[in-house]
Swiss-Prot record:
The chain crosses the membrane at residues 70-90. Keywords: Membrane, Transmembrane, Transmembrane helix. It comes from the Eukaryota. Partially overlaps LSB1. GO terms for cellular component: membrane. This is Putative uncharacterized protein YGR137W. It is a single-pass membrane protein.
Length: 124
């Protein structure tokens, strides 16, 4: 049984494309780990059933444990990707609140406005 990595192809920012590749590589790693676990358990059963043409038999408990672990890891990776994408998108905007020179109250805000033909403009 092979894990089919399902990744929605969204339009990603240039910063989060690296995260997309990290997620893809981690899914490949999880897939190889699940295949090696599957191989170990089925290899153990193969020794006992060597005389009969049974094939590779995997207990259902092992499959359930593997799928629960894979589902948990996929959810954790999805959460990490969402949070890091949000973090990098906030950083990419380069917001510096100290450079805004916000006034202390409305009175100083009204004093700093000047009238133009298009409306009021803040004076720096």
């Amino acid at each position: 049984m092979h894990l089919q990595p399902v990744i929605c192809k969204l339009r990603l920012h240039s910063n989060s494309r690296r995260l997309y590749h990290i997620l893809h590589l981690s899914l490949i790693t999880i897939n190889s780990l699940s295949n090696s676990t599957h191989h170990l358990h089925s290899k153990h059963r193969w020794k006992h059933n060597r005389n009969r043409a049974v094939g590779l038999v995997v207990p259902s408990r092992v499959l359930v444990a593997n799928w629960e672990m894979l589902l948990y890891l996929a959810l954790v990776l999805l959460l990490v990707v969402i949070l890091s994408t949000a973090f990098f998108s906030i950083l990419s905007r380069n917001i510096c609140f100290s450079d805004l020179n916000l006034p202390n109250d409305f009175r100083s805000l009204k004093e700093r406005k000047t009238h133009t033909e298009y409306g009021y403009v803040m004076v720096a």
